[in-house]
């Protein structure tokens, strides 16, 4: 919940206060497409072991840690620049935050599914939503209030430090059992090309990227297209319209503290009530 607002509303408020045009701010919303299209690299996160980290932490936690390192580094990169003189640096950092955050979402969802039985999934989802929303309060209302008094560079630095809570959680959380290999005949393919490096690479890509989509389409047939369209477009309006709301609040003369209190405290607690 913390990184996503540094890609959307909190970022847009910072840019508008620094005099960046609404047109330029709108282009920053494209960074949020990482959340919509994260399904494209989720099979790699599911199947690809990270060197060294995979042995130390396991598949799920190693990817979570890598994503958090990317996010922390990107937040610190953004804090080192200002929109007036380093807009490209902030744009690059925003893309990195979005990619790292989306990857963290993939790995966290996989960890949650693997670590607990089905009867505990609803409880874990509720806990996940609570943590997600508290992160949004920190990156929304908290960041805006801090920026009101100490500037956005200070606020971003504090938020990067808060990400260390998640890093500590990675080391404290249990690692689920190794994910089971996908079926669908991929084991036979991998066995047939064993010893051929090019064939092994092609078989691995098939089992990691192609096979999950084939299994999904075979299982749901033409409904799969509707499901993928819904998943891809479900939050699209929020990403675009929500991103442009804060610049309008700033133009209307509201202070950052007022925007944070109304938009990112009262609204978030209403969402938390719904999660219960």
Could you say what each language-model-derived stretch is?
Residues 34-41, 262-276:
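Transmembrane alpha-helices of Major Facilitator/SLC transporters
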